[in-house]
């Protein structure tokens, strides 16, 4: 089992690497999901997520999550063939957590190569936790 600390990692790059791991058969747990970052302007990012969240109706969807762990899991799902058996099995091997659960306190965390926040050329970024709070989550 691979345990990844999402603190300071770019969400999209993290998600694509995790999707590859899952499709190859690995079990992956991601901790500190609220500390992963989305690159870009804070205002623009908030507006984009507000549009996505308010799309559709309560009755018919689409249903978009507000909690940071579920936002990250939904992002990984978008990079998998989740409607097919292979993708469903891969999603079953993924666990995402806000903070660090008790069972992972002593685990050795792995970082994803090439997904560090230091590769951003500017300081324009927002954490998933901030986006989640903007959407009304109380995590």
From Swiss-Prot:
It comes from Methanococcoides burtonii (strain DSM 6242 / NBRC 107633 / OCM 468 / ACE-M). This protein is one of the early assembly proteins of the 50S ribosomal subunit, although it is not seen to bind rRNA by itself. It is important during the early stages of 50S assembly. Gene3D superfamilies: Ribosomal protein L13. InterPro entries: Ribosomal_uL13 (IPR005822), Ribosomal_uL13_bac-type (IPR005823), Ribosomal_uL13_CS (IPR023563), Ribosomal_uL13_euk/arc (IPR005755), Ribosomal_uL13_sf (IPR036899). Disulfide bonds: none annotated. PROSITE patterns: RIBOSOMAL_L13. Pfam families: Ribosomal_L13 (PF00572). Part of the 50S ribosomal subunit. One of its GO terms (molecular function) is mRNA binding. One of its GO terms (biological process) is translation. Keywords: Ribonucleoprotein, Ribosomal protein. Belongs to the universal ribosomal protein uL13 family. HAMAP family: Ribosomal_uL13 (MF_01366). The keyword Ribonucleoprotein applies. GO terms for cellular component: cytosolic large ribosomal subunit. This is Large ribosomal subunit protein uL13.
